[in-house]
Amino acid sequence: PEASSPAGAEPLAGDKQQPLGADTSDQRGEQPDPAEDDISPGSELAVAILGRPNVGKSSLLNALAGEERSIVSPVSGTTRDAVDTPLETPDGRKYLLVDTAGVRRRGKVAGRGDPAEQAAVEQSLQTLGRADVAVLVLDAAEVPTAQDFRLAERVAERGLACVLVVNKWDAVEGKGTDTSREFEDRIRQGLRPVEWAPVVFTSATTGQRVPKILDAVSAAGAEYRRRLPTATVNLVIREALAWRSPPGQRGKFGRVYYCTQAATSPPTFVFFVNDPKLFPDDYRLYMERQLRSAIGFEGTSLRLLWRGKPAG
């Protein structure tokens, strides 16, 4: 029978390895890809530049391509009419800007609210399937909008790394010492699905802080591909349980037996528990935030999967 003591009293098997036959697919049928675990941290990062029309995506793309980068000839992408642009920095970092032809083609459409804007946003979203990192471009004059939120939602749903780029920063008047912090707070509040993403304030036309974008992309990509030892993961989870136990339901309490990282790209953690139904959404979000607080993972989505496992 189920004990009624809180989860914090249940020891975690911190050195216990993931059972070989464990089912790591989540309730939506997602399955971590073991092949992604072998990606070298120094390998090419696929980067999708997306955002609403008229936020300066095309100008930003041109600024990135011209910022002391050696540009390889554009190569055909895997989707119709897509052209990808490889870039390499002087220190050897490699990037593949996905569907650069599409970014330029969709750069200017009718004003906000026009059906053409919706179509352009939909086309931008199609590039996410081939990306590791999404660079979501925002307009400093109007952030965040409902379309910005929708794009952020899709980035998180895809499980990508993300960098938020606030373009046209040079056009913001009356900036003070706290202006960027206030903007960043507003952006994080308005774009909750990617509140973990770094924010870069830039101007594509002047080149202000453009190099910082690729620095942020590299850092986010490294976190996206990061793997942790099971013992480290369980140490964090044990402390999180000590601070806050799962809520009980009719005298039954959730127990976490152990947790392991099942995949990277994005980092995917499987919690083996007595009953997944005893862990509501707010508690799952708490666990994600504890992982981020203790370990980092700035700039990347995380996936937390919860699996029922009998005790013993």
Regions found by a protein language model. Give the residues of each.
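C-terminal-of-GTPase-core extension/linker across diverse P-loop GTPases
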Residues: 1-98, 106-122, 126, 130-136, ...
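Activation of the activation-loop gatekeeper triad in protein kinase-fold domains
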Residues: 101
